[in-house]
Amino acid sequence: MKKIAIDAMGGDHAPKAIVEGVNQAIEAFSDIEVQLYGDQSRIESYLVKSDRVSIVHTDEKINSDDEPAKAIRRKKNASMVLAARAVKDGRADAVLSAGNTGALLAAGLFIIGRIKGVDRPGLLSTLPTVDGSGFDMLDLGANAENTAEHLHQYAILGSFYAKHVRGIAKPRIGLLNNGTEATKGDSLRKEVYNFLASDSSLQFIGNVEARDLMSGVADVVVADGFTGNAVLKSIEGTAMSIMGQLKSAIAVGGVKAKFGALLLKSSLYDLKDTLDYSSAGGAVLFGLKAPLVKSHGSSDAKAIFHTIKQVRTMLETDVVGQLVEEFSKESDVND
């Protein structure tokens, strides 16, 4: 049985969206147990009772405006902290939260801990492509500043995730840059390019540009945390703007526009599904000793369900255990 600790109080729509997503997951997957951390009375008002769901009551939670490291240290009974502690103590196999991103990353690093050999775990998410296959990108903001060695390791981590979780036999690795030529970019990008090009274990396809990401140019895209986060926000903003403009145009376009939208209903839903990457799950802080997944703060029940599904897949494939073994081999070789 796969045991998942969930911060029920994190996110804009907690605990309602969190608990309703759990209800859906419990019905869909018979091999998971969920531990919900948070206000018991509020959780119970949305929970469909199941012997595979338990509640750990706490009145304390981490707010969106709390300073991450201080919050983790001072709010020891916060729902997020208790969920991470359950993983640390072996009472749960993975942790999920839609709460304060910085605090969750801090909980991952300070409570769960890094895999030996991983310098800086990267925040990885599967983002949309026009053909629906998606691509993995990291780092999406766990580390604002990176060295070339860090980005090389992100490529290794991303390739490992794409192989073991998404089932891609030979993931194509691209380095996000301001041009596709090998000579493009600043000194960091050039150094990273040389690292990746000389690593025979990676299927490195070279530099990729931001404009080509959603066309599926690569299976894994590597970036420093600052750049990766900016690209993520751009994709989110573009998707919301496109859907917003379509809705607005239909609303003010009169009868013809509404009739046209009705005829295109199926295609419009397909477009919405393509741009909505919540069905791919949340962002993984990959490189920790256990799966830690951040769901978007605005997640609804559907997004939480898909994030639980993602966590279940990570546990089913034992991707973290295999990653520990891989880095252990690498450490032995280096020693």
Curated annotation (Swiss-Prot):
Per the record, the coiled-coil ranges are: none
The GO annotation for biological process reads: fatty acid biosynthetic process; phospholipid biosynthetic process
Alphabetically ordered keywords of this record: Cytoplasm, Lipid biosynthesis, Lipid metabolism, Phospholipid biosynthesis, Phospholipid metabolism, Transferase
A single MF term (Gene Ontology): phosphate:acyl-[acyl carrier protein] acyltransferase activity
Q: Pfam families given for it? A: FA_synthesis
Q: Which reactions are catalysed by this chain?
A: a fatty acyl-[ACP] + phosphate = an acyl phosphate + holo-[ACP]
Q: Which InterPro entries match?
A: FA_synthesis, Phospholipid_synth_PlsX-like
Q: What is its main location?
A: cytoplasm
Can you list the GO cellular component terms from the UniProt entry?
cytoplasm
Report the top EC class in one word: transferase
Location relative to the cell: Cytoplasm
Q: In which pathway does it act?
A: Lipid metabolism; phospholipid metabolism
Entry function? Catalyzes the reversible formation of acyl-phosphate (acyl-PO(4)) from acyl-[acyl-carrier-protein] (acyl-ACP). This enzyme utilizes acyl-ACP as fatty acyl donor, but not acyl-CoA.
| Entry-linked PANTHER family | FATTY ACID/PHOSPHOLIPID SYNTHESIS PROTEIN PLSX, PHOSPHATE ACYLTRANSFERASE
Could you give the subunit structure recorded for this chain? Homodimer. Probably interacts with PlsY.
The family this protein is said to belong to? Belongs to the PlsX family.
Query: What name goes with this protein?
Result: Phosphate acyltransferase
Species this protein is from: Streptococcus equi subsp. zooepidemicus (strain MGCS10565)
Q: What gene is this protein translated from?
A: plsX
